[in-house]
Every structure is written in C-alpha cells, then in structure tokens.
C-alpha cells in the first residue's frame, strides 16, 4: 500500500513553515509523496477575506516546484462552498483505494479535532499526523501520530501582517513566492 501525506490549508501565502512540516513528515514516516491540498473555503475561516484561488494556487506551485516528492491536489478546489476534510478524504480514498493517507495537521488543529465535521468517520479514512506548533499542545482524545519538527514560528497570518506593515519577509517564504506577492500587490491593505 502506498503512503501519502496530505497537508491541507488555505496557503495564503504558502511559506517555509509549510514546506518544513511537509519535508519532516515525509522523511519521518517514509512517505512516497506529500500532497498539498489547498482549500476553497475552510469552514473555520468563513467570512474572512481570502486571496483568490488563482493567486493561492500560483503561489503554492511556485513554493513546491523544486521538490519532486511534493504535489498539489486540487480536490477541494473543484467544489464550491465550505471544504470539509471528511468529504475530501472520502472522495480521495475512493479514487485511490491503494493509498494509506496521512493527514498532517499542526498543534492548533489537533486541539480543534473534536470540532471537526464527522470526525469519527474521518478517523476510518486517514491517520492523523500532528506536528508541534508554538503555543499549542498535541493532546487529543483521538489517535494521532506525532512528528517532532524544528521550531519555525511563522504563519500565513504573520506574513500578511508583515506585508501590510511593509516589513521584510525575506527568509520566511520562498523567493519566487515573494516576487509573486510583490508583483501582484497582495496583502498591501
């Protein structure tokens, strides 16, 4: 059976923290690949101003293009409305019955697991992989595999704020993503 990691997110913008997590889990669990799963409208972020799907996808392509073992999965972008992990993973497990999926989440999402839509059924479809994130614990009543990663305290919200305040984001996200953001005037206001 193939082992594939999935890291879902808004990726608004994608940064070195996302890439570090994906790479560390890839090696720790001996995965075949890691798929980045950009979402349409995450249920926990409804109502927030999110950068266009086209821009987020372009930035994600730029961020992941150098890694052979990273791919982008468009499953959630093909649906309108809120993206529920259960619905996505149900589709993916039917589409790829020979794959064991490892769904990678940060400590913030580990704490949020009890509120996930259809969590009990989702546990039958994936193995959750929790990675530590500053300020969060990996304690949950649900079974998760934990992977220790070097601490890298960067988030998409921090980067959006830094761009808004006209602060440098060098060394926090790939240079090609930085150039795209600056050329397209993203996160300026």
Curated annotation (Swiss-Prot):
<keyword id="KW-0547">Nucleotide-binding</keyword>
<dbReference type="GO" id="GO:0004515">
    <property type="term" value="F:nicotinate-nucleotide adenylyltransferase activity"/>
</dbReference>
<comment type="function">
    <text>Catalyzes the reversible adenylation of nicotinate mononucleotide (NaMN) to nicotinic acid adenine dinucleotide (NaAD).</text>
</comment>
<keyword id="KW-0067">ATP-binding</keyword>
<comment type="pathway">
    <text>Cofactor biosynthesis; NAD(+) biosynthesis; deamido-NAD(+) from nicotinate D-ribonucleotide: step 1/1.</text>
</comment>
<dbReference type="Pfam" id="PF01467">
    <property type="entry name" value="CTP_transf_like"/>
</dbReference>
<keyword id="KW-0808">Transferase</keyword>
<dbReference type="InterPro" id="IPR014729">
    <property type="entry name" value="Rossmann-like_a/b/a_fold"/>
</dbReference>
<keyword id="KW-0520">NAD</keyword>
<keyword id="KW-0662">Pyridine nucleotide biosynthesis</keyword>
<dbReference type="GO" id="GO:0009435">
    <property type="term" value="P:NAD biosynthetic process"/>
</dbReference>
<keyword id="KW-0548">Nucleotidyltransferase</keyword>
<dbReference type="GO" id="GO:0005524">
    <property type="term" value="F:ATP binding"/>
</dbReference>
<dbReference type="InterPro" id="IPR005248">
    <property type="entry name" value="NadD/NMNAT"/>
</dbReference>
<comment type="similarity">
    <text>Belongs to the NadD family.</text>
</comment>
<protein>
    <recommendedName>
        <fullName>Probable nicotinate-nucleotide adenylyltransferase</fullName>
        <ecNumber>2.7.7.18</ecNumber>
    </recommendedName>
</protein>
<dbReference type="InterPro" id="IPR004821">
    <property type="entry name" value="Cyt_trans-like"/>
</dbReference>
